[in-house]
């Protein structure tokens, strides 16, 4: 097996041979029977600056902590401890195992395929480099298993090394102090390249120390071989001048520093002294050796050591005219036979010692296969020196590729911020650089006559890397905080001083909001309003002032409106710019807060905002302020501009609806769910009310937290309505607050579920102190009306005189009129004026306008009307929206006007229509509490009967100016279609 080892060693480069020798020594130290790939891998990891260690760190960035690498070393140490020990004498080197031999052959094959210039050479002449040796070792199953135990992937490390080999280009050898090689146990080698940046005396001392350690190690190995009974004739094989070790050994033998070995007092005979033509004068050795042995003392262990010199004389014949192969066969074979005879003749008193290069020793084995047996040779591989800086430039280049600082991306490449923050970042770096420039100038003033190793070391960069990273992190964080829209859009819009036009994409009702909708810039199209630059709000400016260094530019954000116009004119421009709804709906949008407009302008999510505002305003038109607030908040959150959870944006949205309008809040949630996800909302009741209930039968018997968790798990893209959060117990409120902070909700069993992209809407009944409780009473009475069975009919009645509608009467006129009792049993007076003690003109009359508009209602919930126990929850939500008390007079007016317009469109102006007061109250209750929209109900129920009436009017023509069409209750039929609060058919009684 040693013959196989020596053969393999000749195919390795000096650094690879060093690793193999280290592995064999480690196996011998542990008294193992064989040298395995585990020994080689452990040797490669022995040095902190080792090539394999760097590859592991580079391929596993998350495991680059020193403790992780230490764990890898411990795993290999444990694996080596598990290997069986040898039963032979400890003096012999352990042979190479089959697995390691296979790895070495794989490395040789890979090296041959990777080097086209070596493909024409014999297989044994291919030099295996260290990188190919490491790759082959990593392919071994035992090594892969140990690396897996330490959470490292052997294929990943192998791929990293191969990538570094593909990307590396052989550079000019540049001395570098940081390139320290592999730090393996040093051995012999050629002269080391001098580093002009180091003290030459220090280099000389270091070189002498390394050389001394290497020679002592190799000398001890040769001495051990000379003391054996078998395989006692060493041949030092190596490409780094193995003759230096021979000279040290012969010197020790001559002075007697060999201990009690058999070679003590031996004489050294060199073939150089006999003849230059060693192969032809071997026969002369017989007489010379016999004479020397007679003169020596046989009792004192005297003998002769024959120095064969370089064995190239066995395979080369410079003066021969015949081919070298023929000379080797004819003359070399004679020398081998003659020396074998001498060795047998002087057995025990004659030793051989010689040197050979790797190539020479391979040729000796090829041309003289029996030379190792005949001469009782033991090949000793001489370790090369530790690779110093510049000795192996390509290897040093690969090592530098694994250095973290070498592969660090410059700061300006990883800085991800807007142009304004980037300009501030570069300005701050310039200021820091200007401060440190005097030190640089002082360095330039140093005398040039000094050698380089005496000059002060100049930094690679003027600014320390840590300082650059600190400034970079500072401006990254500041930009994320001050300009979140820049980091959350695929199309980044850079603010510029010139005005830009903004338009929106065509509206699509099926477009879901799971993917962000980006505004589109089309400079060729003009709108009535433009986007201008406006200074930041005071709050944002104050934050920027604290974080920004002196001299940083003023931060600007995009807002809607003209800078030169007043705030009132700005409100009109915003409403006009968002002109996607009817004039009736837009005229009440004056109370959109300035903060909402600034947020809207910053995020530039106009498309999404307009879509939400239009849809919710059409369905809940009496709560236009709340609709604007909800649309602004949801559009910002869906585009990543809302509140953040830590440093990351969150997908879930939390809204709080407060106020007395319970029906309006439900309709708002329904419209929001339809617009965002195209589904109906999921309602979960947290209080004691059961009017809406939890319609899902699977929720029965479950706690509120279990209902929420199950809903989130089943529908991660949905809108969940949590009604009456103000009536929930402390446990539920605490769990909801924890879910807001963590992004995960925990059920009653302790299981956590991610909130996903759910929009949570919590409702509460908190309202302003000025809101009258009469609204709640009237809403309850409307529920009673809606619960009764009723139907409508359209009939012709004689017009007795001009009559004003009751909702147009003034308060004084209504107070003078007697109370009218209706057959429906309505127990409250719709015309009774409210108390006027507080000076308010609000009334409980469903036909009277309230004065909330004059009180400056903004749609934002004030903490003054929120109990102290809920302040913490209100501060966590993305937005808290206040719903105003409903103006029932406006609802009645809208119903009447819509019916009149539709009647006039179909019938014409030849016939007028009026609505009975009692019928109007029933229609109001159905529209208010039902799910059917007013326009939809008119198209399905009113339009068909109007078409029939038109046909009869056209055919008969008997109706004059004294006749009017009247919509009234049908007293003959007390039934209504089941499941609907409004009748689906109207009876025509003509």
UniProtKB/Swiss-Prot annotation:
Residues 818-855 are annotated as: Disordered. InterPro entries: ATPase_AAA_core, Clp_N_dom_sf, Clp_R_dom, P-loop_NTPase, SL_signaling_regulator. Disruption phenotype: Low seed dormancy and short hypocotyls. Suppresses max2 phenotypes associated with karrikin-KAI2-regulated growth. Smax1 and smxl2 double mutants have substantial reduction in hypocotyl elongation. Residues 96-167 are annotated as: Repeat 2. Residues 8-167 form the Clp R domain. Residues 12-83 are annotated as: Repeat 1. GO terms for biological process: response to karrikin; response to strigolactone; seed germination; seedling development. A motif (EAR) lies at residues 828-832. SUPFAM superfamilies: Double Clp-N motif, P-loop containing nucleoside triphosphate hydrolases. One of its GO terms (molecular function) is ATP binding. Pfam families: AAA_2, NBD_SMAX1. Keywords: Hydrolase, Repeat, Transcription, Transcription regulation. Induction: Up-regulated by karrikins treatments. Under MAX2-dependent negative feedback regulation. Highly expressed in dry seeds. Expressed in seedlings, rosette leaves and senescing leaves. Detected in roots and axillary shoots. Expressed in the primary rosette buds and expanding leaves of adult rosettes, the vasculature of the hypocotyls, cotyledons, and mature roots, in the midvein and petioles of young leaves, the young leaf periphery, stomata, and the root caps. It comes from the Eukaryota. Interacts probably with TPL/TPR in an EAR-motif dependent manner. Interacts with TPL, TPR1, TPR2 and TPR4. Contains 1 EAR motif required for the interaction with TPR2. Belongs to the ClpA/ClpB family. Probable component of a transcriptional corepressor complex that acts downstream of MAX2 to negatively regulate karrikins/strigolactone responses. Probable target of MAX2 during germination and seedling photomorphogenesis. Acts probably specifically in the karrikin pathway. This is Protein SUPPRESSOR OF MAX2 1. It comes from Arabidopsis thaliana (Mouse-ear cress).
């Amino acid at each position: 097996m040693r013959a196989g080892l020596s053969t393999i060693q000749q195919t390795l480069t000096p650094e690879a041979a060093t690793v193999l020798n280290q592995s064999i020594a480690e196996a011998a130290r542990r008294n193992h029977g064989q040298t395995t790939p585990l020994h080689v891998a452990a040797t490669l990891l022995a040095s902190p600056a080792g090539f394999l260690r760097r590859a592991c760190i580079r391929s596993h960035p998350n495991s680059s902590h020193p403790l992780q690498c230490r764990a890898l070393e411990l795993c290999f140490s444990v694996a080596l401890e598990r290997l069986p020990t040898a039963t032979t004498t400890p003096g012999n080197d352990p042979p190479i195992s089959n697995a390691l031999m296979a790895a070495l052959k794989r490395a040789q094959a890979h090296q041959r395929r990777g080097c086209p210039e070596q493909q024409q050479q014999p297989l044994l002449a291919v030099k295996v480099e260290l990188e190919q040796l490491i790759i082959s070792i990593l392919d071994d199953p035992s090594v892969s298993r140990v690396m897996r135990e330490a959470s490292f992937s052997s294929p990943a490390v192998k791929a990293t090394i191969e990538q570094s080999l593909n990307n590396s280009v052989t550079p000019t050898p540049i001395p570098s102090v940081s390139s320290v090689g592999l730090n393996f146990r040093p051995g012999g080698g050629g002269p080391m390249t001098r580093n002009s940046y180091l003290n030459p005396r220090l280099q000389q001392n270091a070189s002498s120390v390394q050389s001394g350690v290497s020679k002592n190690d190799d000398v001890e190995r040769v001495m051990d071989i000379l003391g054996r009974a078998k395989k006692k004739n060493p041949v030092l094989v190596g490409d780094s001048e193995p003759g230096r070790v021979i000279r040290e050994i012969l010197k020790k033998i001559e002075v007697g520093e060999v201990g009690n070995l058999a070679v003590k007092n031996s004489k050294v005979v060199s073939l150089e002294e006999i003849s230059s033509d060693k192969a032809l004068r071997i026969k002369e050795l017989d007489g010379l050796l016999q004479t020397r042995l007679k003169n020596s003392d046989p009792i004192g262990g005297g003998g002769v050591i024959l120095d064969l010199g370089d064995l190239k004389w066995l395979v080369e014949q410079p003066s021969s005219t015949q081919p070298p192969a023929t000379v080797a066969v004819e003359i070399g074979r004679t020398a081998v036979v003659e020396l074998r005879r001498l060795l047998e003749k002087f057995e025990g008193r004659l030793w051989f010692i010689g040197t050979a290069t790797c190539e020479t020793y391979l040729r000796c084995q090829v041309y003289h296969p029996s030379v190792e047996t005949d001469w009782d040779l033991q090949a000793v591989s001489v370790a090369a020196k530790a690779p110093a800086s510049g000795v192996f430039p390509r290897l040093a280049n690969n090592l530098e590729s694994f250095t973290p600082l070498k592969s660090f991306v410059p700061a300006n490449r990883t800085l991800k911020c807007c142009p304004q923050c980037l300009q501030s970042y570069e300005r701050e770096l310039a200021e820091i650089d200007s401060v440190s420039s005097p030190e640089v100038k002082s360095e330039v003033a140093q005398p040039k006559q000094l050698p380089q190793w005496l000059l002060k070391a100049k930094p690679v960069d003027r600014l320390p890397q840590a300082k650059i990273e600190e400034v970079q992190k500072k401006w990254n964080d500041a930009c994320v905080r001050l300009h979140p829209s820049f980091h959350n859009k695929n199309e980044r819009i850079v603010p510029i001083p010139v005005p830009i036009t903004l338009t929106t994409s065509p509206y699509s009702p099926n477009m879901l909001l799971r993917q962000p909708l980006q505004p589109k810039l089309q400079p060729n199209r003009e709108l009535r309003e433009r986007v201008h630059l406006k200074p930041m709000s005071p709050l944002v400016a104050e934050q920027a002032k604290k974080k920004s260094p002196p001299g940083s530019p003023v931060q600007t954000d995009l807002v809607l409106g003209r800078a030169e116009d007043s705030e009132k004119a700005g409100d009109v421009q915003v409403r006009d710019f968002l002109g996607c709804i009817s004039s009736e709906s837009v005229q009440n949008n004056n109370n959109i807060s300035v903060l909402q407009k600034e947020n809207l302008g910053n995020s530039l999510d106009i498309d999404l905002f307009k879509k939400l505002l239009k849809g919710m305003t059409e369905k809940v038109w009496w709560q236009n302020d709340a609709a604007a607030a909800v649309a602004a908040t949801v559009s910002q959150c869906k585009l990543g501009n809302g509140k953040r959870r830590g440093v990351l944006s969150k997908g879930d949205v939390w809204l709080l609806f407060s106020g007395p309008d319970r029906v309006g809040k439900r309709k708002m949630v329904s419209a929001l769910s339809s617009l965002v996800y195209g589904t109906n909302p999921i309602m979960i009741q947290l209080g004691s009310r059961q009017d809406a209930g939890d319609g899902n039968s699977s929720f029965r018997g479950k706690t509120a937290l279990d209902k929420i968790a199950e809903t989130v798990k089943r529908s991660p893209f949905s809108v969940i309505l949590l009604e009456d959060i103000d009536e929930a117990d402390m446990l539920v409120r605490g769990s909801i607050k924890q879910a807001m902070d963590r992004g995960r909700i925990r059920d009653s069993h302790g299981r956590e579920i991610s909130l996903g992209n759910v929009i949570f809407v919590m409702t509460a009944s908190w309202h302003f102190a000025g809101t009258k409780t009469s609204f709640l009473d009237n809403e309850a009475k409307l529920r009673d009306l809606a619960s009764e069975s009723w139907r409508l009919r359209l009939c012709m009645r004689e017009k007795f005189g001009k009559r004003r509608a009751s909702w147009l009467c003034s308060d004084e006129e209504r107070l003078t009129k007697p109370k009218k009792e209706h057959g429906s049993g309505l127990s409250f007076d719709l015309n009774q004026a409210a108390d006027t003690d507080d000076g308010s003109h609000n009334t409980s009359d469903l036909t009277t306008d309230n004065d909330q508009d004059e009180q400056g209602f903004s749609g934002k919930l004030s903490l003054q009307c929120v109990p102290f126990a809920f302040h913490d929850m209100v501060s966590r939500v993305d937005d808290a929206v206040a719903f105003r008390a409903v103006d029932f007079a406006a609802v009645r007016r809208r119903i009447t006007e819509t019916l009149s317009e539709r009647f006039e469109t179909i019938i014409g102006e030849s016939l007028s229509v009026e609505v009975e007061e009692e019928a109007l109250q029933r229609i109001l209750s159905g529209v208010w509490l039902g799910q059917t929209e007013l326009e939809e109900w008119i198209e399905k129920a009113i339009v068909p009967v109007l078409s029939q009436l038109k046909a009869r009017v056209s055919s008969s023509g008997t109706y004059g100016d004294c006749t009017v069409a009247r919509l009234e209750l049908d007293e003959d039929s007390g039934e209504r279609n089941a499941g609907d609060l409004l009748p689906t058919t109207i009876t025509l009684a003509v």
